[in-house]
From Swiss-Prot:
Pathway annotation: Amino-acid degradation; L-phenylalanine degradation; acetoacetate and fumarate from L-phenylalanine: step 3/6
Primary subcellular site in the record, as a coarse category: cytoplasm
Gene that this sequence comes from: Hpd
GO annotations of cellular component type: endoplasmic reticulum; endoplasmic reticulum membrane; Golgi apparatus; Golgi membrane
Modified residues (Phosphoserine): 211, 226, 250
The name this protein goes by in its record: 4-hydroxyphenylpyruvate dioxygenase
GO biological process: L-phenylalanine catabolic process; tyrosine catabolic process
SUPFAM superfamilies with a match to the protein in the record: Glyoxalase/Bleomycin resistance protein/Dihydroxybiphenyl dioxygenase
Length: 393
């Protein structure tokens, strides 16, 4: 595990502030939005569809804390772009939006460095003000929308209106108190992690924050490599993973196979009270990966000689299958959902940090074993040939 302290020169202009929103392309946006509201504690925020004058795409916007998801579906049978995307990738993340200052400057610099500009800057407005946008191409078919608000006071963005329907079930469900997006992870095919991470360093002037390789993260069967990139202020963190050769197909390779290439593997949602959050998420019916009891037996033993003290009850953490990673300065608590759709692609993470800015490297091996158990149930923990080529899907 390597932590990087060199941020490089501060960009002259064009700040990246934070994650603005995450856009999903799905087969049925209404049902997908309802799923995330019921299972994960989101609430409807805004809507754009036929009733608001949008004739091609319907969008349901949901929010929890400062986390905003936008679920989008095509309205017409001739929408080839969204149709082809769904056939190839299934339901999943299409766009990760960043709120920025000086969108024009960021786009200009990215263009000079060779980035593909999917859509040049444009402005939309309504009675609440103006917003400037631009869209850049990143790994796979994923894009980044830059969002610059120009004295905008609306509930979401121009063209969106308040939802007209209120689900009477939602107020009766326990609150989950997920607050912000901590990080968003992109999976790449083998040998593409470096180029994907370099894209951020070169085009957005991000810097390396953290990394691990397959000598540090591996099980008997599989392994991975990961590089985390971040903006100058370190408010946006983007881990980039790739599989490393092993005896069997890794969960990273399984993702790449079922996603049809690179894409967003998981979104980490931060909370200040993970125990209450996970209790309530389980009450709502959310499924999580389970760490074995041996993990907690070893953890208890190791913590006896650690320089930090975990405040939470180890019995409760074990009961809820929450994982712990730590160093001499602090610790983090984390847990991962099972896939949020039928394809074993996108899942979510819930994380709580106590003076620890890592990504759970100490848990990677245990997590990989839990993932491998799920892979085996799906029939996907398959052998690889000696040269690392898969022997079957």
């Amino acid at each position: 595990m390597t932590t990087y302290n060199n941020k490089g020169p501060k960009p002259e202009r064009g700040r990246f502030l934070h994650f603005h929103s995450v856009t999903f392309w799905v087969g049925n946006a209404k049902q997908a939005a309802s799923f995330y509201c019921n299972k994960m504690g989101f609430e409807p925020l805004a809507y754009r569809g036929l009733e608001t004058g949008s004739r091609e795409v319907v969008s349901h916007v949901i929010k929890q804390g400062k986390i905003v998801f936008v679920l989008c579906s095509a309205l017409n049978p001739w929408n080839k772009e969204m149709g082809d995307h769904l056939v190839k990738h299934g339901d999943g993340v299409k766009d990760i939006a960043f709120e920025v200052e000086d969108c024009d400057h960021i786009v200009q610099k990215a263009r000079e460095r060779g980035a593909k500009i999917v859509r040049e800057p444009w402005v939309e407005q309504d009675k609440f003000g103006k917003v400037k946008f631009a869209v850049l191409q990143t790994y796979g078919d994923t894009t980044h929308t830059l969002v610059e608000k120009i004295n905008y006071t609306g509930r979401f963005l121009p063209g969106f209106e308040a939802p007209t329907y209120k689900d009477t079930l939602l107020p009766k469900l326990p609150r989950c108190n997920l607050e912000i997006i901590d990080h968003i992870v992109g999976n790449q095919p083998d040998q593409e992690m470096q180029s994907a991470s370099e894209w951020y360093l070169k085009n957005l002037q991000f810097h390396r924050f953290w990394s691990v390789d397959d000598t540090q993260v591996h099980t008997e069967y599989s392994s991975l490599r990961s590089i985390v990139v971040t903006n100058y202020e370190e408010s946006i963190k983007m881990p980039i993973n790739e599989p490393a050769p092993g005896r069997k197909k890794s969960q990273i390779q399984e993702y790449v196979d079922y996603n049809g290439g690179a894409g967003v593997q998981h979104i980490a949602l931060k909370t200040e009270d993970i125990i209450t959050a996970i209790r309530h998420l389980r009450e709502r019916g959310t499924e999580f990966l389970a760490a074995p009891s041996s993990y907690y037996k070893l953890l208890r033993e190791n913590l006896k000689s650690a320089k930090i003290q975990v405040k939470e009850s180890m019995d409760v953490l074990e009961e809820l299958h929450i994982l712990v990673d730590y160093d001499e300065k602090g610790y983090l608590l984390q847990i991962f959902t099972k896939p949020m759709q039928d394809r074993p692609t996108l899942f979510l993470e819930v994380i709580q940090r106590h003076n620890h800015q890592g990504f759970g490297a100490g848990n990677f091996n245990s997590l990989f074993k839990a993932f491998e158990e799920e892979q085996a149930l799906r029939g996907n923990l398959t052998d690889l040939e000696p040269n690392g080529v898969r022997s079957g899907m």
